[in-house]
Amino acid sequence: MLERTVCYGTCPAYRLRLSNRGEIRFDSHNPGDEGRRVTDTVAAATLPALISRAKTVGFFDLPSEIAADSVLCHNRATDHPTVIVTVFARAQTKRVEDYHGCFETVEHETLPAITRLRAFEVEVDSALGSSRWVRPANRR
């Protein structure tokens, strides 16, 4: 599952779910668009491939809340969205809350672990084709 929260701006807010049968569920959480749900399917092999990719990027080794880790979130900017990724694997379930305002430096550089996590978040969106349904939120 992947969930993106609102930010101060037009960041789209939604939740994506993928079943082991390849069933996708997209739920909009944008203000004014709440409750819009879309379903579709992808190949059943998509979920095992994403779980394998999660292992490769070190997802299961990350803390459950990036913002609470002073090494991974040394500098914090305001008004960014949060992305919550939950992976239900056979042996374990892991949930990571990634506040996108977390940086290593004031120049907005991130540590490699965060760079890999955020690339994985984009991979999940891409594998499930969420761009078909995502609408920018109304400016807050």
Task: State the predicted function of each range.
Residues Y14-L16, V38, V83:
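Residue-level detector of beta-strand structural context in well-folded domains
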Residues N20-G22, N30, A54, A89-A91, ...:
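A mature extracytoplasmic/lumenal domain signature
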Residues R25-S64:
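A short-motif feature that recognizes glycine-rich, charge-decorated loops
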Residues L18-R21, T41-A49, T86-K94:
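A short, structured loop/turn motif at beta-sheet edges
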Residues M1-E34:
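N-terminal secretory signal peptides
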Residues M1-Y8, V57-R140:
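Short, well-ordered, aromatic-rich surface patches in folded extracellular/luminal domains
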